[in-house]
Amino acid sequence: MPTVRGCSLPDELLYDVENNIWYRPNDDGTVTLGMTAVAAAMAGQLVAFTAKKAGRKVQEGKSCATVESGKWVGPAKIAFDAEVVEVNDALTATPKLANSDPYGQGWMVKVKPADWAAAKGRLTPGSAVAGPYEAKMAADAFAGCAA
């Protein structure tokens, strides 16, 4: 698993580095997504998570959820057109799951992509994500995830 400045980035996932979102394709044609460890560390302890409701269509570059910490409120932008099919109610109830387990219990939503083949081509595979994340962290002056 790639680690950049102490932040884990599992190589079986796909990444939208610019928006700090990871994507995991599922066998049923849906895609699970969430905040990266980088995003969780930058935001600090999350205090609120509000997702678009199941059945909502979300356009590329638009918010599929809003996350809030003590120092930041912002959108979780999706990298492709999709329909929200499931919301992680556990994350809504306990937002800090995104900090403690960003790639497991801290997932945000599951979506049905309009065109997964095209969308997948715009994402960075985990095996190639270390370089782009190092550059982004340097540009953002982010020292890294706490040990």
Regions found by a protein language model. Give the residues of each.
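Vicinal oxygen chelate
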Residues: 82, 96-99
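Short, well-structured beta-strand-loop connectors
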Residues: 52-67, 78, 83
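Conserved, structured core segments of small domains
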Residues: 98, 116-119
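Acidic, low-complexity mobile loops and tails
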Residues: 1-60, 105-115, 122-130, 134-147
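Short, conserved beta-turn/loop elements at beta-strand boundaries and strand-helix junctions
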Residues: 25-28, 86-94
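Short, Lys/Arg- and Gly-enriched loop/turn segments at beta-strand edges
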Residues: 68-77, 93-97
